[in-house]
From Swiss-Prot:
Gene Ontology BP term (one): translation
Key words of the record: Ribonucleoprotein, Ribosomal protein, RNA-binding, rRNA-binding
Protein name: Small ribosomal subunit protein uS11
One GO molecular-function entry: structural constituent of ribosome
Name of the gene encoding the protein in the UniProt record: rpsK
Species per Swiss-Prot/TrEMBL record: Helicobacter pylori (strain G27)
Functional note: Located on the platform of the 30S subunit, it bridges several disparate RNA helices of the 16S rRNA. Forms part of the Shine-Dalgarno cleft in the 70S ribosome.
Amino acid sequence: MAKRNVTAKKKVVKKNIARGVVYISATFNNTNITITDEMGNVICWSTAGGLGFKGSKKSTPYAAQQAVESALSKAKEHGVKEVGIKVQGPGSGRETAIKSVGATEGVKVLWIKDITPLPHNGCRPPKRRRV
């Protein structure tokens, strides 16, 4: 009988980080939340689709709120107490995600920045939808 190769899983190392940056990427289809330290190293992340929301439900404000709460609960385990917020994209979960970061107990918001890239008349946009 052949021996099984068992691979050991990586253990999550608990970091002690006081300040972090919350990146909210709100697209028309999904909302991604990434929490990093001040140097840009990723601590944890969460998405609306990863929480079980499928199809058009991923782009709802409620799904964005749940994604923020999930990511911040993971970040609190690493000791994050103060965060800055960087928001990108035109999605519907954008405002709700910002509000739910501010409403989370034990996390203080230091600043909010909009980092949505705006073209100076770059690429031609796609044609209009006809329904």
